[in-house]
UniProtKB/Swiss-Prot annotation:
Protein name: Small ribosomal subunit protein uS13
Assembly description: Part of the 30S ribosomal subunit. Forms a loose heterodimer with protein S19. Forms two bridges to the 50S subunit in the 70S ribosome.
InterPro entries to which the protein is assigned, alphabetical: Rbsml_uS13_C, Ribosomal_uS13, Ribosomal_uS13-like_H2TH, Ribosomal_uS13_bac-type, Ribosomal_uS13_CS
Pfam families the record matches: Ribosomal_S13
Organism: Ureaplasma parvum serovar 3 (strain ATCC 700970)
Gene: rpsM
Gene Ontology molecular function: any one: tRNA binding
SUPFAM superfamilies, per database record: S13-like H2TH domain (SSF46946)
Amino acid sequence: MARILGVDIPNDKRVVISLTYIFGIGKSTSQQILKLANIDENIRVKDLADEQIAEIRRVALNFVKANGEKLQLEGDLRRTVAMDIKRLMEIGSYRGIRHRRGLPVRGQRTKTNARTRKGPRKTVANKKIETR
């Protein structure tokens, strides 16, 4: 596995997809990095030469430095997202309340579905109806 920006990227995937394993880098950013490095995005990581991997590292680092004020990666981005959610909960906004209650935030229905957010069903035991 190649290590770029402190993250091990998978060998068996195409380079453009492997770079998206870095939290904060999506497909378009990955394509921009590879274009600057003059590397075909369809090559698999395992087929890259050491010089090409070094070039990707260098270009990615320069790309992050050049866009530092608006591009956050890995730990910084995770921390920012967590702080944003915490701030929403503290100010008591609708979105913050939904986060606090563990319900869907973006307006999805909750009468049915929403199981991912709400967790497994909590069944209510119903009383047996006595027959006379």
